[in-house]
């Protein structure tokens, strides 16, 4: 039996916090992100789930969901965000590509999905 993931994360090439909240709300309830200056992130909490949106490498923001959610993998979550936000999204590809290295990400855009090498010292 496969153990259910306790978190999913994707990196979104958008700083539209309202768009991110709107994309998640049908699945998690009314998501309202609020700035947490101590964590330098926008956070939303409910009884079942926590959403953390934080600046990441390049111009991407990390969208991290912890708790109970409907996605079975980071890839499924990233595909939803790419579709809803109409932007490029990156995620850990291990669910479908377990042989990849630590700097390999799946990049999802409207036109395609591809494996890329992405590290903190690379620009978009």
Q: PLM ranges: what are they?
A:
Residues 53-124:
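Charged interaction segments
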Residues 25-40, 88-89, 113-117:
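Short secondary-structure junctions
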Residues 36-61:
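An N-terminal amphipathic alpha-helical segment
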Residues 23-30, 50-52, 68:
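A broad, low-specificity signal for short, low-complexity segments enriched in glycine/proline
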Residues 16-22, 47, 72-74:
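Short low-complexity stretches enriched in small and charged residues
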Residues 5, 9, 48, 74, ...:
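Sparse, context-dependent recognition of short Cys/His-centered cofactor- or disulfide-binding micro-motifs
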Residues 1-25, 32:
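Short, extreme N-terminal segment that most often corresponds to the first beta-strand
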